[in-house]
Amino acid sequence: MGIAYYNLNNRREALNDYKILVSQYPNSPEAEDALDNVKTIYIEESKPNEYADFMRQAGRPLSMDAEDSLTYAAAKTQYDNGNTNAALNAFNSYLQKFPDGVYAIEADFNRAEIYNGKKDWNNALRAYEAVAADAPNVYAERAVLAASRIYFFELKNYEKAEKYYQQLKDLTTNNENKLEAMRGLLRCQYQLQQWTEALANAKDLADAKGSSTDDKALANMTIGKSYQVNNQYDLAISNFKLVVQNNKAALAAEARYEIAACWFAVNKLSDAEKAAFETINKSGSYDFWVGKSYILLGDIYFKQKDYFNAKATYQSIINNTINNDLKNEAQAKLNKVIDEEANSSKVNN
């Protein structure tokens, strides 16, 4: 009768019949079959603890390993059937009971996937990071990739994203994931202005098979920045010029400005002025870099003791920009020009 009830989806009656059979004929072949069917029902209903209790009462207590496997199987059944809320509760119960269980890594990964699907980023990350911390394992690469993306795209936490993109780069043998790791790592280092630290990875990305034109532009920009902060201006300018060749958007505007800044740093003021005007004329839709270029022109005039044009240039930024950082920078420099001009007049008088 138990089988008939089960086929009719009447699990309660099926369980009762199986339990009676086990109780009355514990050593019969039929009892063994009944025990298997009881196990199936409890797993399908995600009630592993009740099954363990039943087996103890039947005089057949489960081993710790068997209970571990059973508890996980119940959770996985819910997950495979798309019952994500029930699966999540079951995975959490499994990990609470078996934190170092045979399936702990798999349970953490599966619950991370559920949390990720719900956009519960913090809980997803806790689970993904637990899997990543136990690398190498079969789920580590996917966990590290997911953690990287959440930190970078959703939370804008570039320090954490950098950590996991680096781990992904070290872990993966998949070319697509390797490219994403290098690209993500470089974007993090760019946001964090870690120019010197980014140099090796930027060169890797620039030379990587399958890297895009945008990848190469960002890599060359970063390489240029690395040389620039280390006062290797010729090498910096060479890489910034490669950016201009490979990119027609914001990176090109920034690269043009940085070329001008490098010329200014080595006191080649004519070249700096020419490069600043090139930024203004060829990247006119990028207000920030146009503003920075005008400020640099003011710096050039100031260095040449051309106080009139320096003041006029800084004042034009103050009057026209909506960027408060640029406005404040121009105002501070204008004040210096006014002070120096006043002091110069006193000396001449």
Provide a role label for each language-model segment:
Residues M1-N349:
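Acidic, polar-rich low-complexity tracts and alpha-helical solenoid repeat scaffolds
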